């Protein structure tokens, strides 16, 4: 119902300047001045930006901003693609395309395989959800694990230093190749060199003359920067100035430490090792290191190991050594004459082990074979290739540090406190997902060996004891050496051979009549040995360690003289 008005002036009117009336709002003098000021300010800003862009620094910053804008645009487009995805598989595909190629390609291949299999089953009238389950379950967990893994390296200090010094490639270090690492190392060394000069000037260096006090202070600042980049500074323990330090820092080491921190070759090695370790942990988090995919180490790392080994062989074959008398010999012959030759290294290990066996027989000691495994939280992947729900993001180095610094250190402390004597050898092996486990051959007095085994067992299962229940064999296994079955040397020989030289364990299995297969990987012994050696080289793991005996260096020197 419409209200009727007797007079026109009684009807409601719109406010002046409202939309739809066609009556513009009156423009004041102040608004005119503000508009003119804004236009003039924008003109001056454009002129200043154009002048700054013409400088080398401005050009470099603009290129960096353009790259960042391009990346942001890619992320936005990927986000739009996910919103428009028709299902979980399409959404997973859109997310996978954002990953680096070494992560993206194998995951996309597996997802595409599952989708084709699912579509084939559905055409046959079967209910199949393999691709959807993989996309909603496994891939979602993989994305979370990758974020957690990257967070271990992309710390606030790491990000801050990379952004402040314009070393943006540090944020994408796992994706770089050797040439790019070389360029980044040169830029990093130059940054440390210029920072050292600024620090010296700031600490009071006059006329280019440096005192030890000024140099030491500058080194401390550079060392903190290197630690932010996950690189251990040279001679850090000897040059630290902590309050708890009992003696003065060894200043004679300062020149060498500064030269290394400002050397491109030193940074090239450090950054390459960091890149390889970071990249391998990403692949472990993506379940690409397992019995189902690539046991012990990733296929990417295995290819790098094979290429480097071939490069080393070509280098050794290309050079010869000549002494002052004119005698020449191939460099390859000299290289493989020492313990670098796996055959010689195995012979030395077996000779030492046989010596321990003979010593134990003379002393009347008994031998026991132990297997120690890390808790479940250190294992990234289950045997069927699925993400381990108990994994806490621990790296391979974390599992090794647990066995060395937590388990073995606690056992030695306990045995020393109780006055118990043991000696033997420990061998380090990878599980299928790259996690470390130990095999130990222990010799001890017959009256003490049971106590030693008991202490070792209690410490091995102490952490996360609740996950074991009544069965402790997943964490700790013990087998007393039975003379009727073999000697201590024969017990450990297989584990020494399978981590050094496949010829020691290769051949035909007498039980099956077929080539021997490694039960841990399901592959031939030759390939398993190659993968174990590549795993140890990648993570810089000490595969064998004798304990409770004097150093073998004296024996090596006497053998060399003989």
Spans of model-derived segments:
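Short hydrophobic/aromatic beta-strand micro-patches
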Residues: 441-445
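Right-hand nucleic-acid polymerase module
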Residues: 1-434, 446-562
